[in-house]
Amino acid sequence: MPSADQILFVNVTTTVAAAALTAAAAVSTTKSGSGNAARGYTDSDDDAGMGTEAVANISGSLVEGLTTVTAALSTAQADKDSAGECEGAVEELHASILGLQLAVPEWEALLTALVLSVIIVLTIIGNILVILSVFTYKPLRIVQNFFIVSLAVADLTVALLVLPFNVAYSILGRWEFGIHLCKLWLTCDVLCCTSSILNLCAIALDRYWAITDPINYAQKRTVGRVLLLISGVWLLSLLISSPPLIGWNDWPDEFTSATPCELTSQRGYVIYSSLGSFFIPLAIMTIVYIEIFVATRRRLRERARANKLNTIALKSTELEPMANSSPVAASNSGSKSRLLASWLCCGRDRAQFATPMIQNDQESISSETHQPQDSSKAGPHGNSDPQQQHVVVLVKKSRRAKTKDSIKHGKTRGGRKSQSSSTCEPHGEQQLLPAGGDGGSCQPGGGHSGGGKSDAEISTESGSDPKGCIQVCVTQADEQTSLKLTPPQSSTGVAAVSVTPLQKKTSGVNQFIEEKQKISLSKERRAARTLGIIMGVFVICWLPFFLMYVILPFCQTCCPTNKFKNFITWLGYINSGLNPVIYTIFNLDYRRAFKRLLGLN
């Protein structure tokens, strides 16, 4: 039996042969006229006409014969295709107590109807709750949730317009509602499912733009733009689903109850619709969610690093020794207070010495120190001076853009207060400079240590010059600090400063910052997990259906059973019931709105 390619070859051959015979007839007519004129025939026109008529008759006979052969081959191929289709589209019928003829046993029909009805009801309830939550719960009434509403509407139409007819068709094994309703049902099926998938793609793109370009996209994400994008989703879905209604199909002209009501298997449309409905959106969602996952993971790492540095929990970072740095002593009831002033200059790369919150040009640092209960620990070189532990809390504030750094220390004991302040200029090298060196000084104002509370404020103001500096005054006293002063290690008086993570005591501001950061990190971790669940569920639900949808028109020997096809089809439909769960169960506001709507508060 000839193949489709052979039939195409015969058709082309027929056309070429007909054209060649027509051309031969024209040439014959011309030659006949020329020859008769040369021989002086007076009835040359009649002879030429007879020759032309003969050639035309021969041509017509050949064309008719070739056309008959082509028609016969086409009919044979069609018969083969019909015979090659999966037989038993309607399997053995089973009688029911209601007098209906069912495609499956009655118990199986009841179980199928029960399970599928539960899926339909849950899908309807879930998507209605999503829609009502957005419009009735104020925290959810934001622009980006309009995409969720559009998705819920698409899934709701699937549950209302598509699934009930599919239940009846699956149980009865035949379509009892006529050809027009069959075509309308199939079109709604493609329209609603495509819209659901494209809405998932739009949600992915919205999240991607919000993460990669948050400032600009926040301005562009207006109600008008979001509604325009949603309208584009539904319009594109209509363009994908409507071509079969205007002729791009292989549906039979005569339709009976025994005729299967199935999606068209016209190969061109199958490729067109599968690309637009699934494979292109799948590629976009995969790329977008990978980018979102990478960006989220990078932000998590950056924030974790910033949280660690901003609480000054540095791990044994020892700064290089400073030349010409001399400790300054102040007495208080026989005890000593040692103060070392130095310059910490960040050079070209400020990030080597500054925390992320200091890297901005305009910030301030506030700190609060408390007296430890036991601070009589000897130094590493036999020095009996007590060591300090101090926690610095970073609070970002806007300042004037000029190069000026000041340090203020205030100590209160019995109503007495002392202050010390200094200024510095930027240096070009990454080093610690002496207190009395170029750029300023740090003068202690008679600081007294004691058993009271000490407050300190370190404010830094840097201009546009990236090479800023911070003057550091480290005091060894009875307070707690995270900065530990190592006494001079040689006779030259050179000292080193070690920053050691000791016991951390956070103030109220620091606790607030940490709590906000923990909440933010927790949200982003949940978002990253949600991305994996979204993609996993989407692929599991829809990939089997679209693989079957694409393969069957090109595989004449592939004959899956009706039960298998129904299972694969319903696996895709289940995605419409899972979408409201996936996109809302991880959101606290949606859970609160659901409880509020269901009266479970």
Curated annotation (Swiss-Prot):
Biased composition (Gly residues): 436-453
Pfam families documented for this protein: 7tm_1
GO molecular function, a single term: G protein-coupled amine receptor activity
Membrane topology note: Multi-pass membrane protein
Signal sequence segment: 1-26
One GO BP: octopamine or tyramine signaling pathway
Alphabetical keyword list: Cell membrane, Disulfide bond, G-protein coupled receptor, Glycoprotein, Membrane, Receptor, Signal, Transducer, Transmembrane, Transmembrane helix
A GO cellular component entry from the record: plasma membrane
Regions of compositional bias (Polar residues) in chain numbering: 361-376
Disulfide-linked positions: 182-261
Free-text tissue specificity from the UniProt record: Preferentially expressed in Drosophila heads.
UniProt-listed Gene3D superfamilies: Rhodopsin 7-helix transmembrane proteins (1.20.1070.10)
Compartments, record wording: Cell membrane
Extracellular topological segments: 27-112, 168-184, 249-273, 553-566
Residues carrying covalently attached carbohydrate according to the record: 11, 57
Region named Disordered: 361-465
Membrane topology, Cytoplasmic segments: 136-145, 206-225, 296-530, 589-601
Residue ranges of the TM segments: 113-135, 146-167, 185-205, 226-248, 274-295, 531-552, 567-588
Function: Receptor for both octopamine and tyramine, invertebrate neurotransmitters, and neuromodulators. The activity of this receptor is mediated by G proteins which activate adenylyl cyclase. The rank order of potency for agonists is tyramine > octopamine > dopamine > epinephrine > norepinephrine > serotonin > histamine. For antagonists, the rank order is yohimbine > chlorpromazine > phentolamine > mianserine > cyproheptadine > dihydroergotamine > clonidine > synephrine. Tyramine has a functional role in the olfactory system as a neurotransmitter or a neuromodulator.
Protein family membership: Belongs to the G-protein coupled receptor 1 family.
Protein name per its UniProtKB record: Tyramine/octopamine receptor
Gene that specifies this protein: Oct-TyrR
